[in-house]
Amino acid sequence: MRDNNAIYGGEMSAHHYFREFAYCDSGMIPWLLIIELMGRKEKKLSELVKDRQQKFPSSGEINFTIKKPEKMIEKVLKYFQDQYLYYDYFDGLSVVFEDWRFNLRISNTEPLVRLNLETKKNLDLLNHRIKKLTKILMSE
């Protein structure tokens, strides 16, 4: 975060890091921000979550055990090479398309590759892309 002057960093394990909090983990700051948003929008948390899930259906973190993860990640990128808008390796492999995106990264704490996928308002596309990526990743 310091190298990139990032304002925020987060993990699926519910760790939240903030530049203005000395780059330290805080669970209280996200809750305060959510409470502020609830008040501003005059909505319950369940309503905010439902709205977000409908706008951006997501897979959640899907874990794979893969023998040669670096090679498999390159295989995934090659498979989509004529389809994506752009990609980067900031935190694993992140690939962005017109109406969906995914991140594939090697876990730092377990022998796993983690997939997170998100679409724009399209649950069918989400399920289709999860199946496609699972098929590629399991094709060792």
Task: Place the predicted regions along the sequence by residue.
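Phosphate-binding and adjacent anionic-ligand microenvironments
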Residues: 1-140
